[in-house]
Amino acid sequence: MAKISKRVAKGREGIDRNRFYPLDEAVKVIKERATAKFDETIEVAMNLGVDPRHADQMVRGVVNLPNGTGRSVRVAVFAKGDKADEAKAAGADIVGAEDLVETVQKGEINFDRCIATPDMMPLVGRLGKVLGPRGLMPNPKVGTVTTDVAAAVKASKGGAVEFRVEKAGIVHAGVGKVSFDENAIAENVRAFADAVIKAKPSGAKGNYLKRVSITSTMGPGLKIDPSTLAAS
């Protein structure tokens, strides 16, 4: 068994792992226990009553966090002509067409989010095996295949978080930094949870929201009382 460091052990002191914490209290505890020498990310995980192996139980979407994510997001855009110019003006880090396809095919992926105009998808489609496993493949369902590239770039830079359920029925995302104030973190958590709840698929049966937990990069995990996730 791996040895637990003194810092981690201290962070877990006083944590009741059987308790469901009100969200606001959980955020306060997480911030107090964050002792790393860097600005830790606040992570939320939601266990859902779905089986993503079935198409009618897939959960995915995008949410614009009201207070941003606190991280610098590099955005790549596949576009030509005026749309390429719009993407650059909006702050895209990488803009290209055939040249960008070649770059990605070589394994050079220096971006966190990928956007494409509809006319570029026949080209971008060739990159499915490269971008798909990394969760970077543009998709119209989450607004990353669009003619309004400027809005998509600004949303990505400003706090848009894409989510997709994993095989075990878990959806998770970074929703801020421990340097955020407590209200900002709580607002982001509630926005994320609301988006996941609204994305409930038609095939979901029984209890959809099974468990919610929150943690920081190096901190303890706390279970959240789901009834406290609604905006007050």
Swiss-Prot record:
The record's listing under InterPro entries reads: Ribosom_uL1_bac-type, Ribosomal_uL1, Ribosomal_uL1-like, Ribosomal_uL1/biogenesis, Ribosomal_uL1_3-a/b-sand, Ribosomal_uL1_CS
The residues forming the signal peptide are none
Gene Ontology molecular function: rRNA binding; structural constituent of ribosome; tRNA binding
List this protein's GO terms for biological process: regulation of translation; translation
Tell me the keywords, alphabetical order.
Answer: Repressor, Ribonucleoprotein, Ribosomal protein, RNA-binding, rRNA-binding, Translation regulation, tRNA-binding
Q: A GO CC term?
A: cytosolic large ribosomal subunit
Instruction: Say yes or no: keyword Ribonucleoprotein present.
Output: yes
Keyword hit for Transit peptide: no
Q: How does it assemble?
A: Part of the 50S ribosomal subunit.
Hey, which family's this protein in?
Answer: Belongs to the universal ribosomal protein uL1 family.
Function per UniProt? Binds directly to 23S rRNA. The L1 stalk is quite mobile in the ribosome, and is involved in E site tRNA release. Protein L1 is also a translational repressor protein, it controls the translation of the L11 operon by binding to its mRNA.
The cross-references to HAMAP family, in alphabetical order and at most eight, read: Ribosomal_uL1_B
Q: What is this protein called?
A: Large ribosomal subunit protein uL1
Show the taxonomic lineage.
Bacteria, Pseudomonadati, Pseudomonadota, Alphaproteobacteria, Hyphomicrobiales
